[in-house]
């Protein structure tokens, strides 16, 4: 089976050695095309062993090409596809901020409510654009939302996306990621655009709670456990924000708002928050500078190592000098303490803190790149989502063609906002 229009000249495509993401059929690398930084998804043809795999791949390429004609600020930009020997190369723009899911789980990053609303609006505007082009994403989740400069969200991964036609307005394929899938998708019921809206509602709940979503196992017919959720909602959460998330997560698809309605609601909420609780300028995208000697990294490590906005790159040399001065001072203090055998508790505490800082592999730099502060291991902060049943694969997504009966035990979401 052939894929036409291979418009990437592979001789001018350079790929770094270490992968930073791995899925069922592909590995993702950082690379360059004619010297410009790009993201490269490398697919071995022999992994596409069945017709369904080719269908999903060709559909993803077709959708990305169609979106390229006009483009949208909240959709990943497609550059092209190439072929060489047994490999296919899917090339997109490189987004250095990592994915939203990992950022939300790391609580050392302060994300004010006005910024959370802005993030939600970015996602909604991108999804509104997709739906206006008759495209369902079908795998909307926080890990498929990349963080660009100035906290701009880019929707990515269109492997399960599908164009909706008048002749075929509904779908029955069970695909996506368990924690974000709507009940009608999991149960094998016909669904349409409203399934994406449910997934968006689950992303909003992650924005609100800044915690992992619990797997919706057989209880509740895959509806939300509202009693458990209530314990995770911060008291300062804007009522309208929580109410919107609950409307998007309505069990009945007909009761969910459209993305056009969602954008309007978030616009109004953003204006209200600025008037009532101005947060000032949004914080800069966090920067993490790695130890220069690192081996092959997982996707979560790499995303953290590459959180470097353009406007802060010029300060990295200054930071390195500051860090060297700190290390030299620490070594001098330690030598003086050893020579004089001073038994001062305060000095010992300071030395211990300094030694801990020296032993860290990473440093988080504040907004002006001038005051490094230590952080714990990247791996301890960012862990992969646990896989659900229902045929989940290594990328946390699942696909199936049949539904399963589930016991039903539902509670009203209104208990959360009354």
Curated annotation (Swiss-Prot):
Compositional bias (Low complexity): 377-402
Pfam families the record matches: Pkinase
Positions of the Protein kinase domain: 14-271
Record keyword Nucleotide-binding present: yes
GO molecular function, one term: protein serine kinase activity
Any one Gene Ontology BP term: signal transduction
Entry superkingdom: Eukaryota
Family label: Belongs to the protein kinase superfamily. TKL Ser/Thr protein kinase family.
Protein's recorded name: Probable serine/threonine-protein kinase DDB_G0280461
Organism: Dictyostelium discoideum (Social amoeba)
């Amino acid at each position: 089976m052939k894929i036409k229009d291979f418009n990437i000249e592979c001789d001018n495509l350079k790929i770094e050695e270490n992968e930073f993401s791995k899925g069922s059929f592909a590995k993702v690398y950082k690379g360059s095309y004619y010297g410009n930084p790009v993201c490269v998804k490398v697919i071995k043809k022999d992994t596409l062993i069945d017709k369904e795999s080719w269908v999903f791949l060709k559909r993803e390429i077709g959708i990305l090409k169609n979106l390229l004609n006009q483009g949208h600020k909240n959709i990943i930009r497609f550059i092209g596809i190439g072929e060489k020997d047994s490999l296919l190369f899917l090339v997109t723009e490189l987004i250095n901020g990592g994915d939203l899911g990992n950022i939300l789980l790391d609580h050392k990053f302060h994300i004010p409510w006005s910024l959370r609303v802005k993030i939600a609006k970015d996602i909604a505007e991108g999804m509104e654009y997709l739906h206006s082009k008759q495209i369902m994403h079908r795998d909307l989740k926080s890990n498929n939302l990349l963080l660009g400069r100035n906290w701009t969200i880019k929707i990515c991964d269109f492997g399960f996306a599908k164009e909706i036609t008048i002749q075929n307005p509904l779908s029955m394929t069970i695909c996506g990621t368990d924690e974000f899938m709507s009940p009608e998708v999991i149960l094998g019921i016909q669904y349409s655009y409203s399934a994406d809206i449910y997934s968006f509602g689950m992303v909003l709940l992650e924005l609100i709670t800044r915690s992992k979503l619990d797997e919706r196992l057989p209880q509740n017919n895959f509806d939300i456990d509202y009693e458990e959720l209530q314990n995770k909602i911060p008291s300062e959460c804007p009522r309208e924000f929580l109410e919107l998330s609950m409307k998007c997560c309505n069990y009945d698809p007909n009761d969910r708002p459209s993305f056009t309605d969602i954008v309007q609601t978030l616009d109004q909420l953003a204006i209200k928050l600025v008037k009532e609780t101005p947060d000032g300028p949004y914080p800069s995208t966090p920067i993490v500078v790695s130890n220069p000697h690192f081996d092959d990294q997982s996707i979560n490590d790499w995303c953290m190592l590459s959180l470097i906005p353009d406007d802060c790159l010029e300060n990295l040399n200054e930071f390195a000098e500051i860090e060297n001065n700190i290390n030299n001072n620490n070594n001098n203090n330690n030598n003086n303490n050893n020579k004089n055998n001073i038994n001062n508790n305060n000095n010992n505490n300071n030395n211990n803190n300094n030694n801990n800082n020296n032993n860290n592999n990473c440093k988080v730099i504040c907004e002006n790149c001038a005051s490094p502060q230590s952080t714990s291991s990247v791996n301890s902060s960012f862990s992969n989502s646990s896989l659900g049943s229902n045929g989940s694969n290594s990328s946390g997504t699942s696909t199936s063609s049949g539904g399963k009966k589930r016991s039903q035990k539902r509670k009203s979401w209104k208990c959360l906002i009354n």
